Amino acid sequence: MANKIEVKELLEAGVHFGHMTRKWDPNMAPYIYMERNGIHIINLYKTAAKIEEANEALKKIAASGRKILFVATKKQAKDIVADKAKAANMPYITERWPGGMLTNFVTIRKAVKKMSSIDKMKKDGTFNTLSKKERLQVDRLRAKLEKNLGSIADMSRLPAALFVVDIKAEHIAIKEAQKLNIPVFAMVDTNSDPREVDYVIPANDDASKSIDKILSLVTTAVIEGLSDRGAEKEVEAAEEAPAAEAEAAPATEE
């Protein structure tokens, strides 16, 4: 059951403000509470329940050691998503979505490795043997790669899930995830089709306060999942230690 404090917090963050009624998607009807001054108002009790449902699944994914890729390229969401994803130690895309990011992941990984090889060149001195023009070209390439792919440099395999802010803006990312059966979690406003995603969080996806509130709640669940994983590993290590010591101990003669 969604608790009242959470609903009050959602209300204060303006999560309930949808789009103008003429822009609505009829599939969002179950999540709409009412119409006010030509604007659809989202039912925050349903939003709170959907956050809890999404958080439970996100926590499990994080606890299993898999990655959740956060995606938000719109201006008012970029910095918020980057900060929250970083805090949760998860990859994110806040610049233009690189076409084939998921469906052609091998090529994307090659581009990420190119960054590493440039860094290696700078460390071992190879970079200094290049001409001034070549060094400039390499630096430009490194900066471009960092801007577009730096935030996914640690993602060595496909993510277990996507978390998206604004499914209309990120429709290419969602299509790629669908092709690969990667579950999509998303903030879905009243002008969007919730059938496009697996875990719908009905919410205002335009106001920064609303985006910040939802991202704070979901990344807290992710961090809890990571914490559970860490605690589990510590317990396993503690259980294995006595057995390892017993095996290593020399046999004593009677």
Curated annotation (Swiss-Prot):
Q: Name one GO molecular function term.
A: structural constituent of ribosome
Q: Tell me where on the tree of life, at the top rank, the source sits.
A: Bacteria
- Cited InterPro entries: Ribosomal_uS2, Ribosomal_uS2_bac/mit/plastid, Ribosomal_uS2_CS, Ribosomal_uS2_flav_dom_sf
Cellular compartments per GO CC: cytosolic small ribosomal subunit
Classification via PROSITE patterns: RIBOSOMAL_S2_1, RIBOSOMAL_S2_2
Low complexity bias located where? 240-254
Q: Where is this region: Disordered?
A: 228-254
Q: Which Pfam families match?
A: Ribosomal_S2
Q: Does the keyword Ribosomal protein apply?
A: yes
> Example GO biological process term?
translation
Which keywords, in A-to-Z order, does the entry hold? Ribonucleoprotein, Ribosomal protein
Q: Which family does it belong to?
A: Belongs to the universal ribosomal protein uS2 family.
Instruction: Tell me what this protein is called.
Output: Small ribosomal subunit protein uS2
